[in-house]
Design a protein with these regions (language model features):
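Conserved N-terminal segment of class I S-adenosyl-L-methionine
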Residues: 1-85, 91-95, 105-108, 199-205, ...
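A short hydrophobic/small-residue beta-strand
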Residues: 42, 121-122
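Residues lining the SAM
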Residues: 95-98, 124
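A short glycine-rich, Lys/Arg-flanked "PGG" loop and its adjoining helix->strand segment in the class I
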Residues: 105-120
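Alpha/beta-hydrolase-fold catalytic nucleophile elbow
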Residues: 124-126, 174
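Short, glycine-/aromatic-enriched active-site segment of Class I SAM-dependent methyltransferases
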Residues: 126-150, 158-159
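A SAM-dependent methyltransferase catalytic signature shared across enzymes that methylate proteins
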Residues: 155-172
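Conserved catalytic loop of SAM-dependent methyltransferase domains
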Residues: 170-204, 230-231
Length: 244
């Protein structure tokens, strides 16, 4: 099944009932909503009040349509100076966020500070190959306010996790069809943020819920992920401090 929105694989999180899960830069709550079917405690942090309002609305809507077993708390804020004590969470997620912030190291240290020892951290950032193409084809892609401020090399993002106390144990490459959509927008559309006919068609193809079960789309996405994924997703386990 194709799901262009879900970077995180719940199976790799090994969720236990009552686990506390933090999503920093949660946006409109795509991963929080996916995890709401589990009996866990979810916390979302984002700078945008509007996005958090949309998250809460979608959470209530989801609860009316299917079983929701999670609790949800939403907090306005950024990744630096998180308002939680050390080791407050069993799992921490931060997807498509680090590439936007000036001091990614400070944010990553905060993510690991609030994560319990042996807890799992999930990070996703744009993959270097698709990102380099987008930067080359369109200056608008990286010059838009609030846009991406860096390109991560694959080895670099792994090293960033290790240097800050998390040992990667799994990596996935995802959402190659999103690379196609962004390339179309960057090279064909005249107005940035105003998708043209081709880009609108691609968005319709990828966004329509009934299309998620189209095997051909899932096959094309999986094939494309070998060459031009949009995102790299890393799972790391927080290293326990050495015993003294």
């Amino acid at each position: 099944m194709l799901d262009r929105y879900q970077a995180v694989d719940p199976a790799k999180l090994n969720l236990k009932p009552g686990a506390r899960i933090l999503d920093v830069g949660c946006g409109t709550g795509r991963h929080l909503l996916e995890l709401s079917r589990y009996p866990v405690n979810l916390v979302g942090v984002d700078m945008s009040r509007e996005d958090l309002r949309k998250t809460w609305y979608m959470f209530l809507l989801t609860a009316n349509e299917q079983p929701v077993n999670a609790t949800l708390e939403l907090i306005v804020g950024g990744g630096e100076g998180l308002p939680f004590p050390d080791g407050a969470f069993d799992r921490v997620m931060c997807t498509e966020t680090l590439e936007h912030v000036p001091d990614d190291g400070a944010v990553l240290r905060e993510l690991l500070r609030v994560l319990k020892p042996d807890g799992i951290l999930v990070i996703s950032v744009p993959d270097e190959y698709s990102e380099r193409l987008l930067w080359r084809f369109s200056e608008r892609y990286y010059n838009t306010p609030g846009g991406h401020v860096r390109i991560y090399r694959r080895k670099q993002i792994r090293r960033l996790l290790r240097d800050n106390g998390a040992e990667p144990f799994a990596v996935e490459y995802k959402q190659s069809l999103e690379s196609v959509r962004w390339l179309a927008h960057s090279t064909i559309d005249k107005e940035w943020g105003q998708p043209g006919r081709i880009t609108r068609s691609l968005r319709w193809l990828l966004d329509t819920p009934s299309h998620r079960n189209w095997r051909v789309l899932a096959w094309l996405d999986a094939l494309g992920n070998r060459a031009l994924p949009k995102s790299i997703v890393l799972y790391g386990r927080k290293v326990r401090p050495a015993a003294r």
